[in-house]
Amino acid sequence: MNDSEFHRLADSLWMTIEERLDDWDGDSDIDCEINGGVLTISFENGSKIIINRQEPLHQVWLATKQGGYHFDLKGDEWVCDRSGETFWDLLEQAASQQAGETVKFR
C-alpha cells in the first residue's frame, strides 16, 4: 500500500465514523471532531476516544479509556496488531462503554 492509498482508506474510516455519529439517535450526547488527521469522539461524561493515522507505519491508532490499539490493514479489515480484533469491534466496545449505551458504527 502506498501513502495515497493509506490516506484514502483512513479518510473512508473517518467519514464512516462521522456519518454514523451524525445519524446518532441515542440518549447520550456524542460529538465528533476532525482536526489535522486526528478524529476525536467526545462523550457526555467528558471521556474521549482519539483515532489517528500513523502514515510512516500505514497504521490507524485508537486510544480509549481501556488502552491503546494499533491497526494494520489485512484484506479489507483494520486488525489490531496485538489482539487480532477488528477496528470496528474495538471502537464499538469502547464507545458503548464510554456512552453507557450500545453504539454501532456498522
From Swiss-Prot:
Does this UniProt record's set of keywords contain Metal-binding? yes
Q: Name one GO cellular component term.
A: cytosol
What keywords are annotated for this sequence in UniProt?
Answer: Iron, Metal-binding
Q: Mention one GO biological process in which this protein takes part, according to its record.
A: iron-sulfur cluster assembly
- PANTHER family assigned to the protein according to its UniProt record, in alphabetical order: FRATAXIN (PTHR16821), FRATAXIN, MITOCHONDRIAL (PTHR16821:SF2)
- Gene name, per UniProt, is cyaY
User: Per the UniProt entry, what species is this protein from, by scientific name?
Assistant: Klebsiella pneumoniae (strain 342)
- Intrachain S-S bonds: none
Give the protein family. Answer: Belongs to the frataxin family.
Provide the protein name.
Iron-sulfur cluster assembly protein CyaY
Q: Which InterPro entries match?
A: CyaY, Frataxin/CyaY, Frataxin/CyaY_sf, Frataxin_CS
Q: What function is annotated for this protein?
A: Involved in iron-sulfur (Fe-S) cluster assembly. May act as a regulator of Fe-S biogenesis.
Q: Name one GO molecular function term.
A: ferric iron binding
